[in-house]
Amino acid sequence: METKKIINNSIAGFFSAITIGALTLLTYKTDYGLFLVASFGSTMVLLYGYPESPFAHTKNIFFGHLVTATVGVTALTFIPLPEYILIPIAVGLGVFFMIMLNITHPPAGGNPIIVIIGSASFDYLISPVITGSVIIIIFGVVLNKFILKKNYPK
């Protein structure tokens, strides 16, 4: 493997740890609430490993997470079905809306599962989904545009 690729991959891994570390610190060491969603870990792979992918675009990260989490909370709140029926319906609807709105972000496909299993309320959309996504996007722009000098965001 060439040296430049090893360096870039190391930087991507380092920034993934820094980004998730910042969200973890905000979650556990402040009184501001929750900033972490499990699917953010997968977002790191796309954002830092494959920033040229359309799935890693800023609008896809932000709106993909927001739409699928909204679908999950809405389904949980308004559809009185057992979780084993509700979860697949919500995931399917989340995928449908991401594709229809051209905001597909594969890691966000897991958000309805997280929301329903965790019995999240609409507050969950503000924090961690919106605040966490914005923080992730800021870190992604700093790394890709200013440090690695990539054409990001597109």
Regions found by a protein language model. Name each.
Residues 52-60, 98-108:
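Membrane-helix interface "capping/anchor" motifs
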Residues 41-42, 94, 110:
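Alpha-helical structural signal
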